[in-house]
Amino acid sequence: MVNTIGFDREKYIEMQSQHIRERREALGGKLYLEMGGKLFDDMHASRVLPGFTPDNKIAMLDRIKDEVEILVCINAKDLERHKIRADLGISYEEDVLRLVDVFRDRGFLVEHVVLTQLENDNRLALAFIERLQRLGIKVSRHRVIPGYPTDMDRIVSDEGFGLNEYAETTRDLVVVTAPGPGSGKLATCLSQVYHEHKRGVAAGYAKFETFPIWNLPLEHPVNLAYEAATVDLNDANVIDHFHLAAYGEQTVNYNRDVEAFPLLKTLLERLMGESPYQSPTDMGVNMAGNCISDDAACRHASEQEIIRRYFKALVEEARTGKDSTQSDRAAVVMAKAGIKASQRVVVEPARQVEERTSLPGCAIELVDGSIITGATSDLLGCSSSMLLNALKHLAGIDDAIHLLSPESIEPIQTLKTVHLGSSNPRLHTDEVLIALSVSAATDSNAQKALDQLKNLRGCDVHTTTILGSVDEGIFRNLGVLVTSDPKFQKNKLYQKR
């Protein structure tokens, strides 16, 4: 069922942009739209909703670009944690700059960055503020508010949101986005609404969060995959009891939105006389659930994503020495979905290679459903071996033909070990691809193999040991979805990334 389309991209772009327009018109005045998830690179959505492209949200906003201004926010504590966007391999700090650049390249207005939960002893955050200001970006500092989100008298006062710096915007639709979850988007929106009303400007709030999908069942795999993706935040999908009480309709939301709803409703009532929303679901503008074209395809894709998240949590715990809290949470999500790690079809073939050779093994599932494996040899690591074998299969090249001869590999090994000081003579995936590119000038088979690289995108891979940063980066750039068993090839205290 690899790459079966389950989501109607064009229907989504049209329906979603129209619904946002309608919400702004219904509320009147200025609208702060909290944009959950990732705008440009929503890899998670593209994995669990096959057919949803990573740029689907920004393509939708392109329809109303001239009406939109962007606010990017980042949690100052994430700078202290050196938090990384795993799908891109860059820090949240760098991703803020990348987001500003990409927005501007597409013609969006973006002038402000908001640092949330800022404390004066956070030296990394203060240094980042100076960096942003040197780059000509306006910065607003939002503080840690004691009692948030329960002490409403304090929050909706000069001692709460009033302590936050106001980001002065010029357009009536302000999209608030961030590098990842937990960045303080909701608090940023509420703080801005507070300051707008203090200035006599009518302003409202709405939320655009792709997951959980409110009109899918609570334990639909698409919604469970969201829980698996946020095990580090301990988020959970819940029934929106406010919506059930107000309308008698059962919808799904996530725990932090439900917990924050009394604050939002109270804030809007104090500022506007009444709240336009009776539930967290009312706040949302998400149309994704209406654009699923093949439920079975989305279920299967989401189940595979849950398993990938489980392996990811195990690997992260092995790398950092943390306890099993996150993988335990992911295991609970797998149990809710009624699936097991063994249902990731590339896991057992990779382990069988290791059992047979006593060295790391690797396996990939290709678009045609074929499982191709790779073993560790004196010349190649298992990922490199698998990559060459997969390209040969896709290109229809006989398995007996060597795309790279030992004679072409040995000089590279000599360069690595003799001149560059590496202790590992085996070729990594980047070195294999460079060697293959050189060979393609004189070898038609090598060129045929290179031409198949595009057909690896979206394929699943499993390795029996944790990948180093080089192989991890190559697979990411190829669009391959990799998991690993949570062990290193060498049993050492220090493990090079």
From Swiss-Prot:
Record lineage: Bacteria, Bacillati, Actinomycetota, Actinomycetes, Mycobacteriales
Family: Belongs to the UPF0371 family.
Organism: Corynebacterium diphtheriae (strain ATCC 700971 / NCTC 13129 / Biotype gravis)
Domain of life according to the entry: Bacteria
Listed name of the protein: UPF0371 protein DIP2346
Xref: Pfam families: DUF1846, DUF1846_C
